[in-house]
């Protein structure tokens, strides 16, 4: 089976939660929960509130996201 296409969006980290989870406000105003992708975790990339991030959303659950890129 091929992987489903993901929806990429921009957002801003609002709050840090336990277990490397973050509350993210997307460009369209929705608030989602996001976790760090494996490559970012391996390279010890730190994410702080106020950082702009790129997230991947799956069409199955639009309330959870995977953080794939961080900009300042």
From Swiss-Prot:
Domain S1-like: 1-72
Pfam families per UniProt: eIF-1a
GO molecular function: ribosome binding; rRNA binding; translation initiation factor activity
Cross-referenced InterPro entries: NA-bd_OB-fold (IPR012340), RNA-binding_domain_S1_IF1 (IPR006196), S1_domain (IPR003029), TIF_IF1 (IPR004368)
SMART domains: S1
Any one GO cellular component localisation term in the record: cytosol
Keywords, in A-Z order: Cytoplasm, Initiation factor, Protein biosynthesis, RNA-binding, rRNA-binding
Subcellular location as annotated: Cytoplasm
Chief place of localization: cytoplasm
Function: One of the essential components for the initiation of protein synthesis. Stabilizes the binding of IF-2 and IF-3 on the 30S subunit to which N-formylmethionyl-tRNA(fMet) subsequently binds. Helps modulate mRNA selection, yielding the 30S pre-initiation complex (PIC). Upon addition of the 50S ribosomal subunit IF-1, IF-2 and IF-3 are released leaving the mature 70S translation initiation complex.
Subunit structure: Component of the 30S ribosomal translation pre-initiation complex which assembles on the 30S ribosome in the order IF-2 and IF-3, IF-1 and N-formylmethionyl-tRNA(fMet); mRNA recruitment can occur at any time during PIC assembly.
Family statement: Belongs to the IF-1 family.
Descriptive protein name: Translation initiation factor IF-1
Gene (UniProt): infA
